[in-house]
C-alpha cells in the first residue's frame, strides 16, 4: 500500500505532495514501483495534530483520487475519518475506506461503509491524534488492542458491514510507546485470533527514529527491518511511503517463508 499524504504538515513528507499534481505524480510513481494499492489522505494524523475542516480535506484529496483512478490500474484507498470525504472519494473512484478512528469519529461512516460494500480498514488508537501520545499506557497491551478491534468489528457488522470486508490495523504509533510498538511488531501474529487480514503501517515513524537516533529522512533502513519482521509475523498489507525497496523486501520475505 503506497501512502500519499496530501497535507502541508505530514510527519513523513512535509508538504512535498500538498500540491495536487505532485500528489498525482507520486501516486503514479508508487504504482510503477510495484504498489498493489494506493492510500490517499488529506489530514495529518501525526501526534498532537488538529482536525482539518471538511471542505479543506475534500479540496485536498478528491482531485487526487479522481485522477489516480483514471491513470493507475490499482485500487485506491481513502484515508479519512469523515463519511462525507469517504463518500466523495468513492464517487470518483476509491474502492477502500481506511478509517484510523475505527468508526468512532463520524457516526455516518458505518452506514456508508455498509452501503458501499467496500473493504474497510479498522485501526486501533488510544485517544485521538491530539491526545494519543500523552503518556499512553495499557494494563495488558495485546488483550486491550484485540478487545478494542473485536468490539469495533462487532460494531461495524451490526451496522451492516460484512465481516469478510474488514481489515484490521494495530495502529503502530497511535497511542503507543516505543516499546509498545516493538512488541506489537514482534508478536503481530497475536492478532490472527481475529481471523482477518492485518495491515501494518510503520513507515518512517518516530519509534524507528528513537531506536536508531535518526531523523525522518533517514529512517528507511529501519522501516525495512520492521517490514520484514511484520511479514514474518503475519502482516498481509504493508503501508509504505517508499515502495520500490519494500516491494522487493516483501517478495523476498514471502519467497523465503514459502520455500
Roles of regions detected by a PLM:
Residues 1:
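Glycine-rich phosphate/adenosyl-contacting loop at the front of the ribokinase-like
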Amino acid at each position: 500500500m503506497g501512502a500519499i499524504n496530501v497535507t502541508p504538515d505530514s510527519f513523513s513528507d512535509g508538504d512535498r505532495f500538498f500540491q495536487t499534481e505532485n500528489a498525482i505524480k507520486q501516486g503514479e510513481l508508487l504504482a510503477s514501483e510495484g504498489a498493489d494499492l494506493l492510500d490517499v489522505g488529506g489530514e495529518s494524523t501525526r501526534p498532537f495534530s488538529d482536525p482539518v475542516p471538511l471542505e479543506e480535506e475534500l479540496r485536498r484529496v478528491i482531485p487526487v483520487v479522481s485522477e489516480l483512478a483514471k491513470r493507475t490500474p490499482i485500487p485506491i484507498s481513502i484515508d479519512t475519518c469523515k463519511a462525507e470525504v469517504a463518500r466523495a472519494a468513492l464517487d470518483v473512484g476509491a474502492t477502500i475506506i481506511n478509517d484510523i478512528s475505527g468508526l468512532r469519529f463520524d457516526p455516518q461512516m458505518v452506514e456508508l461503509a455498509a452501503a458501499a460494500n467496500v473493504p474497510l480498514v479498522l485501526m486501533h488508537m488510544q485517544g485521538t491524534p491530539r491526545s494519543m501520545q500523552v503518556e499512553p499506557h495499557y494494563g495488558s497491551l495485546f488483550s486491550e488492542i484485540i478487545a478494542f478491534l473485536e468490539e469495533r468489528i462487532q460494531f461495524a457488522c451490526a451496522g451492516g458491514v460484512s465481516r469478510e470486508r474488514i481489515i484490521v490495523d494495530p495502529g503502530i504509533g497511535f497511542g503507543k510507546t516505543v516499546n509498545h510498538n516493538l512488541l506489537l511488531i514482534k508478536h503481530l501474529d497475536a492478532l490472527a485470533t481475529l481471523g482477518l487480514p492485518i495491515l501494518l503501517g510503520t513507515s518512517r515513524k518516530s519509534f524507528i527514529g528513537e531506536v536508531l537516533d535518526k531523523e525522518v529522512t533517514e529512517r528507511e533502513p529501519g522501516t525495512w527491518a520492521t517490514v520484514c519482521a511484520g511479514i514474518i509475523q503475519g502482516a498481509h498489507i504493508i503501508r509504505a511511503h517508499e515502495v520500490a525497496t519494500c516491494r522487493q523486501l516483501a517478495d523476498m520475505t514471502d519467497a523465503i517463508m514459502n520455500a
